[in-house]
């Protein structure tokens, strides 16, 4: 085997390794995939993401307990804003969701999502 062939083989192996490790953790779904037994689906999604975002804010030195001093009206406005954000993000990503099969439903309902994946949906 020549040196250039050996180099090409090693480069190809490294490229495959990088691609696999970069994209190996992504969830891919199809519409007919069953929901994960521990998945978060339906109205629970917005509640869980809201809680996770508040936890993230507290971890980063934000409000110590954001839920403690948000009134009912404020909480409703936050929820509406969050749902609006999800809708906008869903519309923006609609084409890529159809192509790649990824998104909050795929990550958290069809699969069991992690705290880090939930945090990606905070604004």
From Swiss-Prot:
Self-association or partners: how does it assemble? Answer: Heterodimer of A and B chains; disulfide-linked.
Q: Which residues carry this modification: 4-hydroxyproline?
A: 34
The cysteines joined by S-S bonds are: 29-106, 41-109, 53-122, 108-113
Please state the span of the N-terminal signal peptide per the UniProt entry.
1-24
Gene Ontology molecular functions: hormone activity; toxin activity
Q: Where in the cell is it found?
A: Secreted
What is the reported tissue distribution? Expressed by the venom duct.
Q: Write out the similarity annotation.
A: Belongs to the insulin family.
State the protein's purpose.
This venom insulin facilitates prey capture by rapidly inducing hypoglycemic shock. Intraperitoneal injection of this peptide into zebrafish lowers blood glucose with the same potency than human insulin. In vivo, when applied to water, this peptide reduces overall locomotor activity of zebrafish larvae, observed as a significant decrease in the percentage of time spent swimming and movement frequency.
Q: Does Signal show up as a keyword for this record?
A: yes
Report the record's Gene Ontology biological process terms.
glucose metabolic process
- What is the first-listed, main subcellular location in coarse terms? secreted
UniProt propeptide residues: 59-102
For this entry, the protein name equals Insulin-like peptide-1
Ribonucleoprotein: present as a keyword of the record?
no
Q: Please give the superkingdom of this protein's source.
A: Eukaryota
Q: Write down the species.
A: Conus victoriae
């Amino acid at each position: 085997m020549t040196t250039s062939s050996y180099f090409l083989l090693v480069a190809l192996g490294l490229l495959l390794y990088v691609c696999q490790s970069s994209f190996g953790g992504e969830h891919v779904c199809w519409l007919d995939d069953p929901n994960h037994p521990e998945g978060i689906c339906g109205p629970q999604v917005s509640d869980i993401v809201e809680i996770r975002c508040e936890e993230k804010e507290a971890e980063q030195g934000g409000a110590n307990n954001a839920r403690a001093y948000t009134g009912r009206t404020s909480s409703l406005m936050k929820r509406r804003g969050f749902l609006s954000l999800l809708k906008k993000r869903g519309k923006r990503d609609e084409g890529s969701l159809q192509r790649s099969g990824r998104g909050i439903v795929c990550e958290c309902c069809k699969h069991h999502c992690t705290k880090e994946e939930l945090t990606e949906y905070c604004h």
